[in-house]
């Protein structure tokens, strides 16, 4: 049933805890918003198939924890990822100032040298903005990143963020083509073990879920 899918892509969402990574993911995949959603523990994972400029791609989207205590899981997150969304909260200058650290992490652990990076300024619906659009755009340009402002609450910019990221990845064949075939996403045994510290049952379930799709 997936014979018309051009490729399968691994996308990461990273950033400080509380910037709305999970909310962006749920808005994009399920079109839902929960104002009381809790912090991600370790990593969450969802699959969504989208069509961009006539090309159908299956996305395996990893929503990562922003807490320092989960950083030991980092190498497993980045392995094989073709795209990463770095998120900050436009109403929190601190989350914007932390972007340099997150970008350093991306560049350190990414196994794809041409990984496409998208910067998303989330929560533009909130009052008390501390980071204006120009600052976000300048940061993105300085680091050769795509850029958009969004609101998971109102939907604004969410779909477009993922579509533009996927479009750019597809325009970079070396990221997803291998020996003439589309790239795949796998959860290795080493990766499963590296992440098992959070919850063995959780990661077994996650591993089983991934195998259903890939």
State where each predicted segment sits.
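Switch I (effector-binding) loop of TRAFAC-class P-loop GTPase G-domains
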Residues: 30-56
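Conserved alpha-helical scaffold flanking the Walker A/P-loop in AAA+ ATPase domains
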Residues: 46, 71-76
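Conserved P-loop small GTPase signature centered on TRAFAC-class small GTPases
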Residues: 1-18, 22, 53-56, 110-214
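Short, conserved catalytic or interaction motifs in soluble domains
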Residues: 16, 30, 35, 89-92, ...
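Switch II (G3) loop of P-loop NTPases
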Residues: 57-70
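Conserved beta-strand segments of the P-loop GTPase G domain that flank and frequently precede/overlap
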Residues: 61-62, 85-89, 119-122, 150
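Conserved Switch II/interswitch segment of TRAFAC-class P-loop GTPases
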Residues: 81-100, 110-114, 124-130
